[in-house]
């Protein structure tokens, strides 16, 4: 039991079984209360403050006694997972969570009533490093690059240089969107690029090793070597649906460069970063040596560092921003205050109102940001580059928000828990969505069989598929498969096939696992099974083609 002086933080079971919903890329699962039998028995997942073991911050926040108490409570938050009547529960504080998830460093900034009330950093810049992360340490923002880039594009719209609803080919000079049957009646527009409704391919970008040849932007758009992604093309009618596309944002980048004649980092620095006071941020790819010395090292899920410390992203608008949580918080505050008509450093109130309006109602994608129907006023984005993950959320109505960045492919797993702690401590009226599962944490600390046993016992309580089901095991399998535990990944995927034999996807995943472990015939067998159940599974077709190629 915590010492009474700690003011222990407690997050309820339903809240922790449902993660943040400002993540943009999947349908939001509806949160519902868990069975009382589950709450009363073994299988809750909640957070409490632990007075005896806390993560030690690397930066001291200037704050009042009350604020320091809030910070201490969040820092002392512990994940507590009861495992059963005969087994000791799992209890971890923030630093232990970071260690369990192979997160070397984490940095965060908290916003209350439109002000950054504190910013702190934890851990080190890389696995095995003794250099601490500070609030000035630079992290890759991943897809949070997109709303910052969208702000620059909207500034050009305000000037009349660009139009939201004009065919982008009218402004593009160095490259054009190839016309096809899908663009006959509906065109690719800037509004559709920013809202992922333009019908464009290529979800995201893996980046390039620091010593690899870099493609031009046109080579990226055409999928020409040395680009490492497919051609960016329209493959459904623009405006007819929403599908996340970093490829579309790359067209947005080229269009801004074409109409201004400026290098993208210069354009963003002049039009957005300097005006908001984001002095530690930039889109330079690769970074100049002086700024490179200020960065964290990207880290894979298994704790190994990214070769060369990070990847380079010529797709700057989609994935190229280097920044800090404090700078991201400044950005979020400016957007919120512009929406309230209290600031116009970059965009007017009218423009930001349009920026935060979903293009396709109910689907969430606005112009650069994602917004949440269940949380009025909330906007945000998450991000992931090779070895880095980040979260940004803000509410323009309440003035509350936070930015969290980590140098790990598991960063969001820890950031989710921290974000809920912040929301609880500061009394945010925030409805979480999308299932959060403790399975990976259990697998890491108690073994994969313990995680599968936990899953089985939890299902016996009648918990819904949204909370714990096929998707939960599939995610666990991939986390293990690409986190240095391939055989454990195979074990999880085999269990998923056993439990959900009518799903074509479970066979596809098991096929991928076998391919990774070098069991070619088993990989072919499972891909064939998946394709038999779902003839439209293009992934299985492509994988089978590669597996059957003569060496």
What do the PLM-derived regions correspond to, one by one?
Residues 81-139, 177, 227-232, 304-306:
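Short, conserved catalytic-motif segment at the N-terminal edge
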Residues 99-107, 128-192, 233-247, 316-319, ...:
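Short active-site loop at a secondary-structure junction
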Residues 122-126, 180-386:
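Short, surface-exposed loop or secondary-structure junction motifs
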Residues 374-375, 408-473, 483:
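Short, gly/Ser/Thr-rich active-site loops of penicillin-recognizing serine hydrolases
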């Amino acid at each position: 039991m915590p010492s009474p002086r700690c003011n222990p933080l407690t997050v309820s079971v339903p809240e922790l079984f449902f993660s943040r919903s400002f993540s943009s890329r999947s349908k939001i699962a509806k949160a519902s209360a868990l069975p009382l039998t589950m709450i009363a028995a073994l299988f809750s997942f909640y957070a409490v403050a632990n007075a005896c073991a806390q993560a030690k911050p690397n930066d001291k926040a200037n704050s009042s006694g009350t604020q320091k108490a809030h910070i201490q409570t969040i820092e002392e938050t512990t994940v507590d997972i009861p495992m059963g009547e005969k087994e000791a529960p799992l209890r971890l504080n923030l630093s232990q969570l970071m260690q369990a998830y192979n997160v070397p460093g984490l940095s965060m900034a908290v916003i209350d009533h439109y002000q950054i009330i504190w910013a702190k950093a934890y851990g080190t810049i890389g696995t095995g490093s003794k250099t601490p992360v500070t609030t000035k340490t630079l992290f890759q923002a991943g897809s949070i690059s997109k709303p910052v880039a969208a702000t620059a594009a909207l500034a050009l719209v305000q000037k009349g240089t660009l139009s939201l609803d004009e065919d982008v080919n009218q402004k593009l000079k160095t490259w054009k969107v190839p016309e096809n049957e899908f663009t006959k009646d509906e065109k690719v527009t800037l509004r559709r690029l920013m809202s992922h409704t333009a019908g464009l391919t290529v979800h995201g970008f893996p980046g390039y090793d620091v010593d690899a040849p870099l493609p031009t932007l046109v080579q990226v758009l055409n999928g020409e070597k040395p680009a490492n992604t497919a051609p960016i093309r329209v493959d459904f009618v623009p405006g007819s649906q929403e599908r996340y596309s970093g490829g579309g944002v790359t067209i947005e980048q080229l269009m801004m460069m074409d109409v201004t004649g400026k290098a993208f980092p210069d354009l963003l620095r002049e039009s957005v970063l300097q005006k908001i006071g984001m002095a530690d941020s930039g889109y330079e790819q690769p970074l100049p040596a002086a700024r490179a010395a200020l960065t964290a090292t990207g880290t894979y899920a298994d704790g190994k560092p990214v070769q060369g410390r990070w990847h380079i992203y010529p797709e700057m608008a989609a994935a190229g921003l280097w920044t800090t949580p404090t700078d991201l918080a400044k950005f979020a505050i400016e957007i919120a205050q512009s929406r309230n008509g209290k600031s116009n450093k970059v965009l007017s109130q009218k423009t930001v109102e349009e920026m935060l309006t979903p293009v396709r109602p109910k689907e969430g994608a606005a112009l650069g940001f994602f917004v949440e129907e269940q949380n009025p006023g909330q906007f945000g984005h998450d991000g992931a580059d090779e070895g880095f993950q980040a979260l940004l959320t803000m509410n323009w109505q309440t003035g509350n928000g936070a930015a969290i960045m980590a140098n790990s492919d598991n960063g969001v797993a820890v950031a989710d828990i921290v974000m809920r702690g912040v929301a609880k401590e500061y009394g945010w009226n925030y409805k979480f969505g999308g299932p959060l599962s403790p399975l990976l944490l259990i697998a890491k600390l108690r073994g994969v069989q313990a995680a599968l046993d936990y899953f089985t016992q939890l299902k016996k309580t009648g918990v819904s598929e949204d909370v714990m089901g096929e998707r939960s095991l599939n995610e666990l399998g991939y986390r293990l498969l690409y986190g240095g535990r391939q055989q454990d990944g195979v074990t999880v995927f085999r269990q998923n096939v056993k439990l959900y034999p009518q799903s074509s996807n479970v066979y596809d995943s098991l096929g991928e696992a076998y391919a990774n472990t070098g069991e070619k015939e088993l990989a072919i067998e499972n891909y064939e099974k998946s394709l038999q159940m779902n003839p439209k599974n293009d992934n299985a077709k492509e994988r089978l083609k590669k597996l059957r190629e003569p060496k």
